[in-house]
Amino acid sequence: MSHAIIASIYEAKLIAWSKARTEPIKVVFENVKYEPADGETYLRAFMLPGETASSTLAGDHRAFIGVYQVSIVAPANSGKTKTNPLVVELTALFRLYARDTKSGFTVVTMSPVEQGPGITDAATYMVPLSFQYRADTGS
């Protein structure tokens, strides 16, 4: 259940950031179909939950560990002029060791935002960004 809380924290953070931009950008989350307008750049966000661990003999501790990925999707053949500024903005948004809390549940960004290689297909150019997270509950 707590991976779901973590997803909701990061989704809310992305939505608030997008709305605050001079030019808001569409953010599409998991299991949502989206047909972009011609020439539109948008984001796709994914939760990649990892292990749920416990480090106490009583079993009252849980560590929720995983990766959060935000992919920038731009039109093919548009170069990096649309993606590079977004990489900078998203890197600043998800700062290393940032603590985000919802209803007493805190998640920490455990790694710097890492940019993966751009992936081109016939219609789009996608730049994946990801970082590791961790949230601890219990003793």
Where are these regions (language model features)?
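Mid-chain, well-packed structural core segment of small domains
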Residues: 73-94
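Sterically constrained small-residue positions within well-ordered secondary structures
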Residues: 36, 61, 118-122
